[in-house]
Amino acid sequence: MKNAKQKICTVLASCLTLLPLSACNGDNGDVKTVQINEVTHSVFYAPLYLADALGYFEEENIKIELTNGGGADNVMSAVLSGDADIGFCGPEAALYVLIGGSSDVPTVFGQLTKRDGSFLVSRVAEPNFTWENLKGKEILAGRKGGVPAMTFEYILNEHNLKDGVDLTLNYNVAFNMMTSAFETGTADYCTMFDPVAYEYEAAGKGYVVASVGEASGEVPYTCFMAKNSWIERNETTAEGFLRAVTKAVKYINETDAATVAPYLLAYFEGTSETSIAASVQRYRDIDAWRTNLTMTETSFNRLQDIIENAGELSRRATMNELVNNTYADKVYNEIYND
C-alpha cells in the first residue's frame, strides 16, 4: 500500500496548481461528457453499462467515456490529476488520501457494489471445497493494500488461516495480469471476476470453488467518487448520474438475465451472450448491487476492520469525512416512491 499511497500523493502534489479541463463543463443544460475511470471492466459493474445502453444517461444529458484504470491506485491518481471526473473503485483509495492528511480528498457520492465480486478459482475440481483446503497452497491475491487482497485475507483469518504460516498469498502480480499469470502456472488458486471466471471454467482451465463476496459479507466494495470541486460545479450531473445508475440497478434486479445480456454485448467484445447472462445471474445470486446507492455506516466500519486486519490503516475515519449520501438518497426516493 505504501507505493500506492506515494503514487497518489505525488500526483496530488503535481496537480494542485492545475485546473482540470472539465472545470468549464458546469451544469448549463448541455450534454455533459463525463470521464469515468473504472478499476476494472467486469459484468460485476453491469448496472453502470446498462445505464448507458438503456439510454438512462442520455435522459440525464450525460455522455460517459470509460477508461479502465487497472487498479484503484491508478483510478485515484486519475481523479486527483483531473484526468477523470469520476473514479469508480474501492473507497479505500479515497480513505488513504484522507488519512494521509490531504485537504483535497475525493468524496464518495455513490456505492454500486456491496460485496466482493470475485470468485476463487482452483486448478482442480473441489465439489466439497472448504477454506481449509487452502492450507499449504499459494493464492494469487492481487495488489497488497487493495480491497480485493485485504478482503480475501480477512476471510482467511476468519477461518484461522494466516498468510506465511498456513498458506502463501502472492501479491507480486498486477491485478489485471492475475488470470494470465495463473494460466501460465503461477499459484494453485486465483481470484477472478466474471465473465473471466465463468469463461475460464467453461474452457476447462479451472474450477470456481467459492464466492469471495458471499464469504466476506457486505462491504462498500466499489463506489463512485469525485473531487469536491467537480461535484460543486456539476451537482445536477452528479445527481443525474446516480439517477441513471439507480434505474439500471432496478432494471437488472427485475429483469431476466437472458434479457439483460444482449444490452451488455457491446461492452464485452469477444464475450458470448451466454457467458454474460450467466455472469449477470451469478451476481444477482450473491446480491451484489446496492438498490439505494448510499453507503451504510456498518459496512464502512467493516471495510475499516478489513483494512486494519491487513495492517494497512494508521487511523480510523468517520464515514462523514469521506461520504456524501445526499444525492443517492434523493434519487432512490424519487424512483422507488413513484
Where are these regions (language model features)?
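Pocket-lining segment of extracytoplasmic ligand-binding domains
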Residues: N176-F268
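Secondary-structure end/capping motifs
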Residues: E232-R315
